[in-house]
Amino acid sequence: VPMIPQQGKESLPHPEAIPVSRRSVPLLGSIACGEPIFADEDYSVSVALGHDVDCDFALRCKGDSMIEARIYDGDIVFIKKQDFVDDGTIAAVLIDDDATLKRVYKLSDGRIELRAANERYRPIFVGGPDDTRTFRVLGKAVAFQSTIL
């Protein structure tokens, strides 16, 4: 809490200061915002955030495929673990051993479309009849912390 220095007295809390409750979640590594990259987990690093953010872990974004959603290279995205997400939700997903952050859409033919928020990137389709890759939703993006000022 910011303090107001008082001459000859102990400092007093600033009258407009709002106390913020913080906690830490593991920063598990990086996630692709571009082409999927190998998913590695490192539980030794954590990142602080407010108690009001309901998430289980964080990932550092690599790439520019989500810039139209205001998620930039180097940003930290906070993920709430869940197996399914609603259409259009930004989610961390795993394709085989590669993780990526994209908007997720379920198509009428049963496939999943993973759509970037940058028109320079083509959608990724998974789950077709000839697709032997494994696909899993890791969780929903619930917040992000930007390094851009």
Model feature map: region roles:
Residues V77-I79, A92:
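Hydrophobic beta-strand signal
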